């Protein structure tokens, strides 16, 4: 079994040197991701595609490879194929007949062939020969060239025949790290998660800057979002997660700033702090999830005033998107459930926000801040490799709270997303297993029997640890992490 990785069309349009560079980087990215699934993963770059080989003795890797390839930027689509050699057109037909005879029963069909190399036949001749044979010697309902029930896809590359078993749509975009790095201001909500994803997809290593306004619980939730985005879409490269303690800034805003200017000034302070972080990291651009008119600070007038506080490029990929479209994308990329459980902190500090801020007035209000305020919060910022989020949870959750065995009376809570739990349900003899997705656990845990002990489970142990830490912050001492 092999996968044929087809490049995103915009890559194919590049000049030869750029195209080669992008293809090499995509090959490396694929190898980096798949080696985390299996160390023996083999990836081979060709001019217009990349081949991924699955060992014949490891059919269990097919689905895992397919899932990972579908989430790597730079891929248009992936073809899951069975590979063989052929000698004649009739040989191609005979192999196709064996592969598709049962599937064609009672269905209309057509045959589509792509060919590369030197042959004494063309693609249309193969389509006619194979299609005619299948129509005559199978129980198919007949040939239909437009809107058939089934299309038999074949690819011929010199003397190799690829019988296409499945087509998997890719993420599109450019390979990771073909574009410059960006620093995404992430709050954990719908918008910042989607805007971060847009730049990952476009080929930028996306680092995360979080302004903590809500304490440890807020930070835990946002780290889950950032870790999910990195693990699913950007795992081929290292990125940083920066947490800036912004409660001193909020406190001074509440004490010293005119109520109507609070929202705009808070955003300006965030941009100033993010600019300093970006400059330290050698990053040229900031990314935000702002959409025009969505809230009071996001009118064109206010966005203009916000941008005046920094010379750093501020990118807003969602600027003209509707909220529902943003939510739909968040659902597709798996951040919707996180966002639902994280409150919006920025909006609570101003009761009557202005929609037409005046720069001079804003600057006059900002003069009331302590001179060293930003210096202090930047000095206290925590910068970690995003992979360390899992390690951090290990250090905060003691050894007695992480177990690999289940005691009598303990209950397992499977915190995986519903689709993951349904795909491979956790079944243990003599043990009660409750399926409560991570995004519902915070609200449903209080309804559980307080006399019982609960063990949280997920595939990699990251989400279960984050949820355990969150519940412990809430005062629950009857929760542990289950790592079999």
UniProtKB/Swiss-Prot annotation:
One of its GO terms (molecular function) is tRNA binding. Residues 406-484 form the Rhodanese domain. It is found in: Cytoplasm. It is an enzyme of class 2 (transferase). It comes from the Bacteria. GO terms for biological process: thiamine biosynthetic process; thiamine diphosphate biosynthetic process; thiazole biosynthetic process; tRNA 4-thiouridine biosynthesis. One of its GO terms (cellular component) is cytosol. Its main location: cytoplasm. Disulfide bonds join 346-458. The active site is at 458 (cysteine persulfide intermediate). This is tRNA sulfurtransferase. It comes from Shewanella pealeana (strain ATCC 700345 / ANG-SQ1). The gene is thiI.
